[in-house]
Regions:
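Juxtamembrane/disordered regions of integral membrane proteins
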Residues: 1-142
């Protein structure tokens, strides 16, 4: 495993995660409006900012895990497409164990659930595509 490229791929994944996340909320203000319909479920924005460092660390760890999985699945290196393929699997996993799980356990509506499912699925496809773009195996000399 190429640890320097793994670190760079993780960084690329983090950048992709946040760029997409900010762009998504800018392009889909209706999604933010949906979140605001559930003030008893979600923290107000000011309160979220107080715990945001923990969330950012968790996101970083999750993306590092995705990069390690990518490196183990593609030891000879890969492409954006192979990264997007892994992202599709991770995106489906996230939708099933996070988004649908929240729909069942939290008092939120189907509209917010659909927004989250589409947004988070695409986010992981993009993150892993960025990982696939950057990660390359170590150069070996015969």
């Amino acid at each position: 495993m190429n640890y320097a490229r793994l670190a760079l791929a993780s960084l690329a994944g983090v950048v992709a995660y946040f760029v997409y996340g900010f762009a998504m909320f800018a392009a889909l203000p209706a999604m933010k409006t949906e979140f605001l319909k559930y003030p008893n479920v979600y923290r107000p924005e000011k309160e979220m900012m107080k715990v945001m460092p923990f969330g950012m660390i968790a996101i970083l760890v999750g993306i590092i895990v995705a990069a390690v999985l990518y490196a183990k699945i593609n030891p000879a290196g890969g492409t954006i497409a192979s990264g997007a393929s892994l992202g599709t699997l991770i995106g489906l996993f996230v939708v099933c164990v996070f988004v649908i799980h929240n729909y069942i356990n939290l008092n939120i509506g189907i509209t917010l659930t659909v927004y989250q499912a589409v947004a988070y699925f695409l986010q992981w496809v993009i993150v892993c595509a960025a990982i696939g773009l950057v990660y390359k195996p170590p150069i070996t000399t015969p």
